[in-house]
Amino acid sequence: MKILVDAMGGDNAPLCVLQGASQAAAEFGDGMTLTLLGEEKAIRDCAKENKIDLAPFEIVNCTENIDMHDDPVKAVRHKKDSSLVKGLTMLKNGEADAFVSAGSTGALHVGTSLIVRTVKGVKRPALATPMPGAKQNFLLLDCGANVECRPEMLNAFGTMGSVYAEKVMGRTAPKVALVNNGAEDTKGTPTYREAHQLLKANPCIHFAGNIEPRYIMDGEADVVVCDGFVGNVVLKLTEGVAKTLLGMLKKIFLQNIITKLSYLGIKGGLGELKRMMDSEEVGGAPLLGAAKPVIKAHGSSHAKGIKNAIRQAKLCVANDLCGTMEKALGEVAAQKEEADA
Protein backbone atom coordinates (compact mmCIF):
# COMPACT_ATOMS: atom_id res chain seq x y z
CA MET A 1 0.00 0.00 0.00
CA LYS A 2 1.40 3.39 -0.99
CA ILE A 3 0.10 6.62 0.50
CA LEU A 4 1.07 10.03 -0.86
CA VAL A 5 1.51 12.89 1.61
CA ASP A 6 1.54 16.56 0.62
CA ALA A 7 4.58 17.80 2.54
CA MET A 8 3.97 21.45 1.65
CA GLY A 9 0.27 21.68 2.53
CA GLY A 10 -1.04 23.38 5.66
CA ASP A 11 -0.11 26.17 8.05
CA ASN A 12 2.63 24.15 9.75
CA ALA A 13 4.28 22.51 6.74
CA PRO A 14 6.71 21.01 6.20
CA LEU A 15 7.79 20.43 9.83
CA CYS A 16 4.54 19.07 11.27
CA VAL A 17 3.90 17.02 8.13
CA LEU A 18 7.31 15.37 8.44
CA GLN A 19 6.81 14.78 12.17
CA GLY A 20 3.35 13.29 11.61
CA ALA A 21 4.55 11.08 8.77
CA SER A 22 7.43 9.86 10.96
CA GLN A 23 5.02 8.99 13.75
CA ALA A 24 2.74 7.18 11.31
CA ALA A 25 5.63 5.17 9.89
CA ALA A 26 6.74 4.18 13.39
CA GLU A 27 3.29 3.33 14.79
CA PHE A 28 1.49 1.64 11.91
CA GLY A 29 3.91 1.60 8.98
CA ASP A 30 3.87 -2.16 8.37
CA GLY A 31 2.70 -2.88 4.84
CA MET A 32 2.62 0.83 4.01
CA THR A 33 4.95 3.04 1.99
CA LEU A 34 4.78 6.79 2.51
CA THR A 35 5.79 9.14 -0.28
CA LEU A 36 6.40 12.82 0.51
CA LEU A 37 5.67 15.37 -2.21
CA GLY A 38 7.19 18.85 -2.13
CA GLU A 39 10.34 20.87 -2.63
CA GLU A 40 13.00 18.26 -1.87
CA LYS A 41 15.58 20.74 -0.59
CA ALA A 42 13.08 22.29 1.84
CA ILE A 43 12.07 18.82 3.04
CA ARG A 44 15.65 17.69 3.58
CA ASP A 45 16.71 20.96 5.23
CA CYS A 46 13.74 20.80 7.62
CA ALA A 47 14.43 17.15 8.44
CA LYS A 48 18.11 17.85 9.09
CA GLU A 49 17.38 20.85 11.30
CA ASN A 50 14.84 18.91 13.37
CA LYS A 51 16.64 15.54 13.33
CA ILE A 52 13.90 13.70 11.44
CA ASP A 53 14.95 10.46 9.75
CA LEU A 54 13.85 10.44 6.11
CA ALA A 55 14.93 6.84 5.53
CA PRO A 56 11.36 5.43 5.70
CA PHE A 57 10.12 7.75 2.96
CA GLU A 58 10.26 8.21 -0.76
CA ILE A 59 10.48 11.85 -1.86
CA VAL A 60 9.00 13.27 -5.06
CA ASN A 61 10.40 16.72 -5.84
CA CYS A 62 7.90 19.46 -6.76
CA THR A 63 8.89 22.90 -7.98
CA GLU A 64 5.60 24.69 -7.30
CA ASN A 65 3.25 25.12 -4.36
CA ILE A 66 -0.40 26.08 -4.01
CA ASP A 67 -1.10 28.40 -1.10
CA MET A 68 -4.37 29.32 0.60
CA HIS A 69 -4.68 32.57 -1.38
CA ASP A 70 -4.47 31.01 -4.84
CA ASP A 71 -7.61 30.72 -6.95
CA PRO A 72 -8.40 26.97 -6.75
CA VAL A 73 -9.30 26.43 -10.42
CA LYS A 74 -6.40 28.50 -11.79
CA ALA A 75 -3.97 26.87 -9.38
CA VAL A 76 -4.97 23.34 -10.36
CA ARG A 77 -4.83 24.15 -14.07
CA HIS A 78 -1.54 26.05 -14.06
CA LYS A 79 0.53 24.69 -11.17
CA LYS A 80 0.98 21.19 -12.55
CA ASP A 81 4.21 20.64 -10.62
CA SER A 82 2.73 21.54 -7.24
CA SER A 83 2.68 18.88 -4.54
CA LEU A 84 -1.13 18.87 -4.52
CA VAL A 85 -1.68 18.51 -8.26
CA LYS A 86 1.19 16.07 -8.74
CA GLY A 87 -0.10 13.94 -5.87
CA LEU A 88 -3.62 13.77 -7.29
CA THR A 89 -2.22 12.96 -10.74
CA MET A 90 -0.10 10.11 -9.36
CA LEU A 91 -3.18 8.81 -7.53
CA LYS A 92 -5.24 8.92 -10.72
CA ASN A 93 -2.53 7.09 -12.67
CA GLY A 94 -2.46 4.22 -10.19
CA GLU A 95 0.96 5.11 -8.77
CA ALA A 96 -0.46 5.19 -5.24
CA ASP A 97 -3.51 4.10 -3.25
CA ALA A 98 -4.41 7.31 -1.36
CA PHE A 99 -3.50 10.97 -1.01
CA VAL A 100 -3.35 13.09 2.16
CA SER A 101 -3.12 16.89 2.19
CA ALA A 102 -3.59 19.72 4.70
CA GLY A 103 -3.43 22.23 1.86
CA SER A 104 -6.08 24.43 0.26
CA THR A 105 -9.53 22.86 0.61
CA GLY A 106 -10.75 24.53 -2.56
CA ALA A 107 -7.80 23.38 -4.65
CA LEU A 108 -8.03 19.84 -3.25
CA HIS A 109 -11.73 19.68 -4.05
CA VAL A 110 -11.30 21.07 -7.57
CA GLY A 111 -8.27 18.87 -8.20
CA THR A 112 -10.05 15.76 -6.98
CA SER A 113 -13.08 16.49 -9.17
CA LEU A 114 -11.02 17.26 -12.30
CA ILE A 115 -8.16 14.80 -11.93
CA VAL A 116 -9.15 11.85 -9.76
CA ARG A 117 -12.84 12.13 -10.69
CA THR A 118 -15.77 10.70 -8.74
CA VAL A 119 -17.45 7.33 -8.40
CA LYS A 120 -20.46 6.64 -10.59
CA GLY A 121 -23.52 8.46 -9.32
CA VAL A 122 -21.63 11.34 -7.65
CA LYS A 123 -21.25 14.74 -9.32
CA ARG A 124 -19.50 16.67 -6.56
CA PRO A 125 -17.51 15.07 -3.71
CA ALA A 126 -18.19 16.34 -0.20
CA LEU A 127 -15.98 16.64 2.88
CA ALA A 128 -17.44 14.33 5.51
CA THR A 129 -16.18 14.69 9.08
CA PRO A 130 -17.04 12.40 12.01
CA MET A 131 -18.09 14.62 14.92
CA PRO A 132 -18.48 13.85 18.64
CA GLY A 133 -22.03 13.72 19.98
CA ALA A 134 -23.54 13.28 23.44
CA LYS A 135 -25.09 9.90 22.55
CA GLN A 136 -22.87 8.85 19.65
CA ASN A 137 -20.65 10.35 17.01
CA PHE A 138 -22.22 11.48 13.76
CA LEU A 139 -21.19 12.41 10.24
CA LEU A 140 -21.26 16.08 9.19
CA LEU A 141 -21.20 16.91 5.48
CA ASP A 142 -20.34 19.06 3.68
CA CYS A 143 -17.60 20.58 5.83
CA GLY A 144 -16.18 23.01 3.30
CA ALA A 145 -15.78 21.53 -0.17
CA ASN A 146 -18.96 22.98 -1.72
CA VAL A 147 -19.61 26.43 -0.27
CA GLU A 148 -22.69 27.01 -2.42
CA CYS A 149 -25.03 24.10 -3.08
CA ARG A 150 -28.16 23.51 -5.09
CA PRO A 151 -31.01 21.63 -3.41
CA GLU A 152 -30.21 18.56 -5.51
CA MET A 153 -26.65 18.52 -4.14
CA LEU A 154 -27.86 18.60 -0.54
CA ASN A 155 -30.16 15.70 -1.36
CA ALA A 156 -27.20 13.79 -2.85
CA PHE A 157 -25.15 14.48 0.29
CA GLY A 158 -27.94 12.90 2.31
CA THR A 159 -27.72 9.75 0.21
CA MET A 160 -23.91 9.64 0.30
CA GLY A 161 -23.80 10.24 4.03
CA SER A 162 -26.42 7.58 4.66
CA VAL A 163 -24.45 5.05 2.63
CA TYR A 164 -21.25 5.90 4.50
CA ALA A 165 -22.97 5.71 7.89
CA GLU A 166 -24.43 2.31 7.06
CA LYS A 167 -21.50 0.70 5.26
CA VAL A 168 -18.55 2.22 7.15
CA MET A 169 -19.90 3.35 10.52
CA GLY A 170 -22.09 0.27 10.90
CA ARG A 171 -25.34 2.16 11.53
CA THR A 172 -28.68 0.47 10.86
CA ALA A 173 -31.22 2.68 9.09
CA PRO A 174 -29.16 5.84 9.73
CA LYS A 175 -31.14 8.99 10.44
CA VAL A 176 -30.41 11.93 8.16
CA ALA A 177 -31.11 15.51 9.28
CA LEU A 178 -30.80 18.87 7.51
CA VAL A 179 -29.23 21.80 9.37
CA ASN A 180 -31.67 24.70 9.53
CA ASN A 181 -32.73 27.65 11.69
CA GLY A 182 -35.92 25.89 12.74
CA ALA A 183 -37.54 22.47 12.79
CA GLU A 184 -40.53 23.44 10.63
CA ASP A 185 -40.62 22.51 6.91
CA THR A 186 -41.03 26.18 5.99
CA LYS A 187 -37.86 27.38 7.74
CA GLY A 188 -34.66 28.43 5.99
CA THR A 189 -33.65 29.86 2.64
CA PRO A 190 -35.39 28.81 -0.59
CA THR A 191 -32.51 26.40 -1.24
CA TYR A 192 -32.89 24.73 2.13
CA ARG A 193 -36.70 24.61 1.91
CA GLU A 194 -36.48 22.85 -1.45
CA ALA A 195 -33.73 20.54 -0.19
CA HIS A 196 -35.97 19.61 2.73
CA GLN A 197 -38.71 18.50 0.34
CA LEU A 198 -36.25 16.49 -1.78
CA LEU A 199 -34.78 14.75 1.25
CA LYS A 200 -38.27 14.08 2.58
CA ALA A 201 -39.22 12.40 -0.70
CA ASN A 202 -35.92 10.50 -1.03
CA PRO A 203 -36.84 6.78 -0.80
CA CYS A 204 -33.25 5.74 -0.10
CA ILE A 205 -32.75 7.51 3.23
CA HIS A 206 -34.43 7.83 6.62
CA PHE A 207 -35.00 11.58 6.80
CA ALA A 208 -35.56 12.93 10.30
CA GLY A 209 -36.32 16.49 9.19
CA ASN A 210 -34.60 19.76 10.03
CA ILE A 211 -32.22 20.02 12.95
CA GLU A 212 -31.38 23.28 14.71
CA PRO A 213 -27.67 23.91 15.39
CA ARG A 214 -28.17 23.74 19.16
CA TYR A 215 -29.28 20.10 18.86
CA ILE A 216 -26.60 18.89 16.43
CA MET A 217 -24.21 17.75 19.17
CA ASP A 218 -26.90 15.64 20.86
CA GLY A 219 -26.01 12.86 18.43
CA GLU A 220 -29.63 11.99 17.65
CA ALA A 221 -28.95 12.08 13.91
CA ASP A 222 -26.40 9.76 12.28
CA VAL A 223 -25.87 12.09 9.32
CA VAL A 224 -26.15 15.89 9.41
CA VAL A 225 -26.39 17.56 5.99
CA CYS A 226 -25.57 21.17 5.08
CA ASP A 227 -23.67 23.17 2.48
CA GLY A 228 -19.93 23.61 2.84
CA PHE A 229 -20.16 27.14 4.21
CA VAL A 230 -22.50 26.19 7.05
CA GLY A 231 -20.63 22.94 7.70
CA ASN A 232 -17.27 24.67 7.96
CA VAL A 233 -18.71 27.24 10.37
CA VAL A 234 -20.24 24.47 12.50
CA LEU A 235 -16.96 22.55 12.50
CA LYS A 236 -14.75 25.50 13.44
CA LEU A 237 -17.23 26.93 15.94
CA THR A 238 -17.37 23.55 17.69
CA GLU A 239 -13.57 23.44 17.85
CA GLY A 240 -13.41 26.99 19.18
CA VAL A 241 -16.09 26.47 21.83
CA ALA A 242 -14.42 23.27 23.03
CA LYS A 243 -11.03 24.98 23.30
CA THR A 244 -12.48 27.99 25.14
CA LEU A 245 -14.58 25.87 27.50
CA LEU A 246 -11.65 23.66 28.46
CA GLY A 247 -9.52 26.75 29.04
CA MET A 248 -12.19 28.28 31.28
CA LEU A 249 -12.50 25.07 33.29
CA LYS A 250 -8.73 24.96 33.74
CA LYS A 251 -8.73 28.50 35.18
CA ILE A 252 -11.56 27.61 37.57
CA PHE A 253 -9.79 24.50 38.86
CA LEU A 254 -6.52 26.37 39.43
CA GLN A 255 -8.07 29.07 41.63
CA ASN A 256 -7.15 27.56 45.02
CA ILE A 257 -6.14 24.38 46.82
CA ILE A 258 -9.73 23.13 47.16
CA THR A 259 -10.49 23.52 43.46
CA LYS A 260 -7.16 21.86 42.62
CA LEU A 261 -8.09 18.86 44.77
CA SER A 262 -11.50 18.75 43.10
CA TYR A 263 -9.77 18.70 39.73
CA LEU A 264 -7.86 15.54 40.68
CA GLY A 265 -11.16 13.73 41.09
CA ILE A 266 -12.36 14.46 37.57
CA LYS A 267 -9.04 14.76 35.77
CA GLY A 268 -9.63 11.54 33.85
CA GLY A 269 -13.07 12.63 32.68
CA LEU A 270 -11.82 16.01 31.52
CA GLY A 271 -8.98 14.34 29.69
CA GLU A 272 -11.46 12.11 27.86
CA LEU A 273 -13.60 15.15 27.01
CA LYS A 274 -10.55 16.96 25.64
CA ARG A 275 -9.64 13.93 23.54
CA MET A 276 -13.19 13.67 22.15
CA MET A 277 -13.22 17.33 21.13
CA ASP A 278 -9.71 17.35 19.65
CA SER A 279 -9.93 17.62 15.85
CA GLU A 280 -6.47 16.09 15.56
CA GLU A 281 -7.83 12.80 16.93
CA VAL A 282 -9.88 12.43 13.74
CA GLY A 283 -7.04 13.69 11.59
CA GLY A 284 -8.94 14.50 8.45
CA ALA A 285 -12.10 14.28 6.41
CA PRO A 286 -12.50 11.99 3.41
CA LEU A 287 -13.71 13.57 0.20
CA LEU A 288 -16.79 11.39 0.02
CA GLY A 289 -17.57 10.35 -3.53
CA ALA A 290 -14.01 10.58 -4.90
CA ALA A 291 -12.98 7.68 -7.13
CA LYS A 292 -9.93 7.03 -4.92
CA PRO A 293 -9.23 7.88 -1.27
CA VAL A 294 -8.41 11.57 -0.78
CA ILE A 295 -8.10 12.78 2.81
CA LYS A 296 -8.21 16.48 3.74
CA ALA A 297 -6.32 17.14 6.96
CA HIS A 298 -7.11 20.30 8.92
CA GLY A 299 -5.14 23.28 7.62
CA SER A 300 -3.75 23.95 11.10
CA SER A 301 -2.83 20.30 11.72
CA HIS A 302 0.15 19.50 13.89
CA ALA A 303 1.99 16.18 13.92
CA LYS A 304 -0.83 14.20 15.57
CA GLY A 305 -3.38 15.45 13.05
CA ILE A 306 -1.20 14.46 10.09
CA LYS A 307 -0.48 11.07 11.64
CA ASN A 308 -4.18 10.35 12.13
CA ALA A 309 -5.04 11.59 8.63
CA ILE A 310 -2.56 9.04 7.29
CA ARG A 311 -4.15 6.41 9.56
CA GLN A 312 -7.54 7.28 8.09
CA ALA A 313 -6.16 6.99 4.56
CA LYS A 314 -4.76 3.56 5.37
CA LEU A 315 -8.13 2.41 6.75
CA CYS A 316 -9.95 3.73 3.66
CA VAL A 317 -7.67 1.71 1.40
CA ALA A 318 -7.79 -1.41 3.57
CA ASN A 319 -11.61 -1.32 3.71
CA ASP A 320 -12.01 -0.41 0.01
CA LEU A 321 -14.08 2.66 0.90
CA CYS A 322 -14.40 3.90 -2.67
CA GLY A 323 -15.39 0.51 -4.03
CA THR A 324 -17.91 0.06 -1.24
CA MET A 325 -19.32 3.53 -1.88
CA GLU A 326 -19.72 2.94 -5.62
CA LYS A 327 -21.40 -0.42 -5.05
CA ALA A 328 -23.73 1.01 -2.41
CA LEU A 329 -24.65 4.00 -4.58
CA GLY A 330 -25.46 1.58 -7.39
CA GLU A 331 -27.84 -0.21 -5.04
CA VAL A 332 -29.35 3.13 -4.04
CA ALA A 333 -29.87 4.10 -7.69
CA ALA A 334 -31.54 0.75 -8.37
CA GLN A 335 -33.88 1.27 -5.40
CA LYS A 336 -34.77 4.74 -6.67
CA GLU A 337 -35.55 3.40 -10.15
CA GLU A 338 -37.74 0.72 -8.60
CA ALA A 339 -39.53 3.31 -6.44
CA ASP A 340 -40.10 5.57 -9.47
CA ALA A 341 -41.42 2.71 -11.62
Where are the model-predicted features located?
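N-terminal charge/polar-biased segments
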Residues: 1-5, 11-15, 29-31, 44-45, ...
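Short, glycine-rich nucleotide/cofactor-binding loops
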Residues: 5-15, 145-155, 296-302
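Short beta-strand segments
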Residues: 6, 37-38, 60, 101-103, ...
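Short glycine/serine/threonine-rich phosphate/pyrophosphate-binding segments
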Residues: 13-17, 43, 81-94, 98-112, ...
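Glycine-rich phosphate/diphosphate-binding loop of Rossmann-like nucleotide-binding domains
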Residues: 15-16, 28-35, 41-44, 50, ...
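Phosphate/nucleotide-donor binding subsite
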Residues: 51-96
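Glycine-rich phosphate/nucleotide-binding loop
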Residues: 113-126, 130-140, 220-224, 228-338
